[in-house]
Structures are given as C-alpha cells and as structure tokens.
Amino acid sequence: ELNFYKDQLKDKVIYCNCDDPSESAFTDFFKLNFDYLGIKKLICTRYQKSNLFTYADPVRRSGYRLEITAKNKNDKKPVKINLKEDGDFRSPECIELLKEADIVVTNPPFSLFREYIELLVKYNRQFIIVAPDSALHYKDIFKLIKSNKLWLGYGRVKEFIQSDGTIKKMGNVGWVTNL
C-alpha cells in the first residue's frame, strides 16, 4: 500500500505512533526503503503497558522512541530513547511528536479507533492507517468520508506478519487515508 504514496512521503517526517519499533513491519519497511521513498525522518514510539513489575521501575514503565534519519539509517541497532511516559499515543509527549510529524502511518488499536482519528483530525495530520471495516460505519468517521476528508486506500490488508514470524489472515481490515 505504501508504495502508492511515494511522492507524498518524499521529504516528510513519518510517525508510527502505535507500533512497537522492535516488532513493527512499518519500521522495517521504512528503514529498508528510506532512500527509495526519500523520507526525511522516521519516528516510532512504543507503548509500555503497566503491570505489577514495570510499575515499580520507572525506566521499565516508560515507553521509548526510535528516530531514524539519513545519518543513522544503516545502524544495525538504532538508539532507543526512553520516553518520560508510557508511550500512549494520547500522552502529551507523544502528541508533541505527532505535531512534529508530517504523515502518520500505523496500525492503531481498533478499540480506540474513534479517539485515534479524532486526534489526527484535531492536529491536522496526514495519515495512512490500517482500519477495521466496521469503523467506516461510525457516525463520526462516516462524516469524514462524506466531507471528503478521509477515504479508502488502494488495497486491503489480507494478512500480516506477526512478531513471532507467523502470518495472520485478515478479512475485515483495510487502509484509510487523507493523502
């Protein structure tokens, strides 16, 4: 899907704010195609869920960000920068990164999809994101489609590679964008 947007991605700061950079196919794709796409910078943030063990340790409780630029794009292990907070896309720290971004590319949590789109619209960000088909029927999402502020991408998400290397089949997921 992303190859269809090569011209729009050129010289842009791309933000993947809902994908663990150590496991994300988006991170891998942008790192491998950094020069081909001509992107300026890639920012990825990781959400760190709180649990009994991470809550007691402030370092383990925080999420992290990964930034890839022309200078470090070939590094085998780019530097992970700890966030002050947990890396939730709604946190003030991640919203500041969102403001820096030109285009957001991610697979947001479907349970928070309305809230996620609302944030992108509020900050006037361009995006290419994975979405459940059911979201197209949400009243607030349908208004965006009707007013030509959001439309379907070129393709469908039929399957994706999970962090353990297995392939998960999908049948009800597609791309939405405002590019």
Report residues per predicted region.
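Class I S-adenosyl-L-methionine-dependent methyltransferase catalytic core
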Residues: 1-179
